[in-house]
Amino acid sequence: MTKLLSLRSTRASWIDGLREEQAAAALQVLGIAGFALLTALGAQFSARVYLWEVPITLQTLAVYGSGLFLGARNGLLAQLLYLSLGLFVPVYAGDGTGVAYFAGAASAGYLLAYPFAAAVVGFLSKRWKTLAGSTVAMLAGSALLFTVGVSWLHYAADHASWWTSIDRGWLRFVVIDLAKIIAVAVVYSGVRGLFPAEDA
């Protein structure tokens, strides 16, 4: 039980070689481009619930994953690349594109928080590589993501109260986001276990 709840892992993995402090330049570029593409693909799986101002997407799976697998800097760069692509190509949820999207989308704050959420996850998971550690790292990234997203939503949607913004921008997504975090943590922990460094 103690080992299960431990944040730090003493076991190295081949997967750790993908992070910026260890990866070759070509592998770093591939990782950044790959997670930018995964984030774009996640936006295509978008569901809008009636009267909900923020769509449900799979993007945060890639946001959290980019921090875990690539580290803070490259996770941030992957999400910046995704946002940059969206200025010219319709890769945002709902086929949104361009600077005008940010001016009119109530959910744009979440997008702007992606790079920073990935960086937080990457920074914390540099040492916290266990199932519990990666989960805590993603919870911290999620807290930042929703803080920025809800704040943007409050002013963009002109809500009468902060409680309305918190309800519509966070509380409705808590269970969904926790499920995503657990899924990514299980995959990350499982992959690290499958590829120990001594077998690489």
Describe the residue ranges of each PLM region:
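Structural signal for the C-terminal ends of transmembrane alpha-helices
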Residues: F69-R73, V120-W128, G190-F195
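Alpha-helical membrane segments and adjacent membrane-interface helices in multi-pass membrane proteins
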Residues: F45-A119
